[in-house]
Amino acid sequence: MNRFFYTVGLIFLFSFFILYSPKTSDLSNNVDLHQQLLISLQKEEERCDLFSGYWVQDLRGSQYTNVSCSSIPESKNCFMQGRPDAGFSQWRWKPDGCELPRFDPGTFFEIVRGKTMAFIGDSVARNHVESLLCLLSSEEMPLGIYKDTEDRTRTWYFPHSNFTLMVIWTRFLVLDEERVINGSVTGVFDLHLDKMDKNWANKLPEIDYAILSDAHWFFRKNYLYEKGKNIGCIFCGEPGIKSLDIDSALQMVIKVVLNYINNCKKCRNILTVLRTFSPAHFADGAWDTGGSCNRTHPLGEKEIDLASLDWKIRSIQVEEIKRVRPVARRRKKFEVLDVTKAMLMRPDGHPNSYWGNKWMKGYNDCVHWCMPGPIDAWNDFLIALLRRHAFTDFTWS
């Protein structure tokens, strides 16, 4: 720990020296030394597994409130919706053996200056972006420059930092077609593994950071196809069709998506970050049978189930990132944002009944996350990953 802070201090010292040194002839040597220090810090961070740890109480609370951040959606604004307890927002993630620094918007903007970042996924990916927007708004307010008719895909621009932030809606990452019977939608989907969802695939060449997530839409009947041929289904139990587990079907999808990105010839220097599964915490029923999540404190590590389907899904996501890394093509990098263990411990962080459910009375939200709340730690993780890669970008071209 002392060595970590010593290295950080040296970095700031030499950054100042480089900027204000009166001897331009020494600039090259100073930059080389600064680069070495940055790499030293990177190695220091890499010795620590940020995603293995526990939650510790932090009475400072969140870096924003539902008053200071005006962009919190009503469905995640648990305090505005009447949630009486505030303790769930007063915890921080503590990795084993090191510290996870709080999110710093200034550092974030320096890393992403002139870049485009896209969060590609479902409504939980949107939840992640909403947390990031609140954290960034203390430094710079964005301009909303695009919104589709359903407000699912959006783009914001931060002019001072020349940074573009996008959230791109997709259910499965690959092309999906909902089955229609007698003119009515069924909630059953055909997934085509050899075709990407164009909502994000068409935008990929303009993206520098792609934050992917997937899984929640797999918990239903879905049919998988490859080159027009059915290769299996989830929850169908039909004769003549191969039955697939959720995790194995998801692994097929993640594999083809990562391969697609790796083979993208028009893409920039792209860092792809796969965010692992964000678990739901319905107790005493499912989402449509009265299930709820009314805890007010985190769980300990010994209280979570690492043999659960949630963990299996997380494991195949990590496995696929490990598979693609050794074969990553030039200008492609792959990382994992491993939030599953941390979030398995946070059944207290969901809106539950405090989500303003005017149209769905009696249904609780134990999938998304209150804001502020434990989801803010995802951005602590994210900036740590970005910082690691920024330190190696001197030679990444």
Swiss-Prot record:
Q: Where is this motif: DXXH motif?
A: 365-368
Q: What is its main location?
A: Golgi
- What's a GO biological-process term for it? xylan acetylation
Enzyme active site: 123 (nucleophile), 365 (proton donor), 368 (proton acceptor)
Q: Where in the cell is it found?
A: Golgi apparatus membrane
EC nos:
2.3.1.-
Q: Which family does it belong to?
A: Belongs to the PC-esterase family. TBL subfamily.
Q: What is this protein called?
A: Xyloglucan O-acetyltransferase 3
Q: Tell me what gene encodes this.
A: XGOAT3
